[in-house]
Amino acid sequence: MSLNLDAMMTERRNPASAAIDTLSTLDILNLINAEDSKVAPAIARILPQIAQAVDAVSAAFARQGRLIYCGAGTSGRLGILDASECPPTFGTPAGQVIGVIAGGEPAILQAVENAEDNPQAAQDDLQRLALSSRDVVVGIAASGRTPYVLGALRYARGVGATTVALSSNPDSPMAPLADILLTPIVGPEVITGSSRMKAGTAQKMILNMLSSAAMIRSGKVYGNLMVDVEATNAKLVERQIRIVMEAGECDRATAVEALERSQRQCKTAIVMVLSGLSATEAQALLERHRGFIRPALDER
């Protein structure tokens, strides 16, 4: 079956870059930068829809559900990137945020021929994850018509999972399969059809919003501090200390002692410092308030 590329926004020629091959290096960069500046306003226009998606994800987390990104090529890699950052940043359990890419692990580093054209493969991948109605599936495809992503959304809808479609083409085939439709219209690319550029930038920004805002809504952030950060390297050990110092308004020695007594749990250490409770008492208080620091402290 042939595709009508002319009908797709992401495949149209951009008149602003029609002679880009004749420009100086600096002028090429100025043009790319000018086109990139259109991405944030495009996202601003769909913030209400992004908010709906965030609320759906945080609700899924509250019922022990998962956020699952599905995509092919750049779109799949961006989902994996966002998912992989959640455990160290927010202390999420393995498997709470998952990135699935057409072609599997080999496709992370290089293109896998025809992988994106197989909708059944998406169903198989989601079945292996035991997808359920508790989960949220975000299908990512700049074109809005990638068969693998369409297959993922179709299967997800069939099992009752919440479906979110992220595309840069209006009226895409993904739309009827989505409970929530995210369509940042960034316009034609500087290099025709290279949707890793503006469309990919929009995807990255929106995925940042989805996961970060959902984690904030789930109590993973206090003020603007990542209070569930895991100390997996020297930099993050130091970050934990600084977080407890700032949130607890205490000196370094107090923060270090609280972290040691709480087995390096930032939230517990913060509540200990601010309330005077023991580690066991602070942890129990946090558990009563589903890990949210503010209501835990209010109870004191």
Curated annotation (Swiss-Prot):
**Which EC number applies?**
4.2.1.126
Q: What induces it?
A: Induced by MurNAc 6-phosphate that releases the repressor MurR from the DNA. Repressed by MurR in the absence of MurNAc 6-phosphate.
Q: Which CDD domains match?
A: SIS_Etherase
Q: How does it assemble?
A: Homodimer.
Q: Does the entry annotate any disulfide bonds, and if so which pairs?
A: none
Q: Which intervals hold domain SIS?
A: 57-220
Query: What family is reported?
Result: Belongs to the GCKR-like family. MurNAc-6-P etherase subfamily.
What is the designated name of this protein?
N-acetylmuramic acid 6-phosphate etherase
NCBIfam families, per the entry: N-acetylmuramic acid 6-phosphate etherase (TIGR00274), PRK05441.1 (NF003915), PRK12570.1 (NF009222)
Q: What else is known?
A: A lyase-type mechanism (elimination/hydration) is suggested for the cleavage of the lactyl ether bond of MurNAc 6-phosphate, with the formation of an alpha,beta-unsaturated aldehyde intermediate with (E)-stereochemistry, followed by the syn addition of water to give product.
Q: Which reaction does it catalyse?
A: N-acetyl-D-muramate 6-phosphate + H2O = N-acetyl-D-glucosamine 6-phosphate + (R)-lactate
| InterPro entries xref list | Etherase_MurQ, Glucokinase_regulatory_CS, MURQ/GCKR, SIS_dom, SIS_dom_sf
What SUPFAM superfamilies does the entry give? SIS domain
Record's keyword terms, sorted: Carbohydrate metabolism, Lyase
Q: Name one Pfam family in it.
A: GKRP_SIS_N
User: What PANTHER family does the entry give?
Assistant: GLUCOKINASE REGULATORY PROTEIN
Q: What does the record list as GO biological process?
A: 1,6-anhydro-N-acetyl-beta-muramic acid catabolic process; amino sugar catabolic process; N-acetylmuramic acid catabolic process; peptidoglycan turnover
Which top class of enzyme applies to this chain?
A: lyase
List the top taxonomic levels of the source: Bacteria, Pseudomonadati, Pseudomonadota, Gammaproteobacteria, Enterobacterales
Q: HAMAP family recorded for this chain? A: MurQ (MF_00068)
Pathway(s) of this molecule: Amino-sugar metabolism; N-acetylmuramate degradation; Amino-sugar metabolism; 1,6-anhydro-N-acetylmuramate degradation; Cell wall biogenesis; peptidoglycan recycling
Transcription in keyword set: no
Q: What does this protein do?
A: Specifically catalyzes the cleavage of the D-lactyl ether substituent of MurNAc 6-phosphate, producing GlcNAc 6-phosphate and D-lactate. Together with AnmK, is also required for the utilization of anhydro-N-acetylmuramic acid (anhMurNAc) either imported from the medium or derived from its own cell wall murein, and thus plays a role in cell wall recycling.
MF terms from GO for this chain are: carbohydrate derivative binding; carbon-oxygen lyase activity; ether hydrolase activity
**Active site positions:** 85 (proton donor), 116
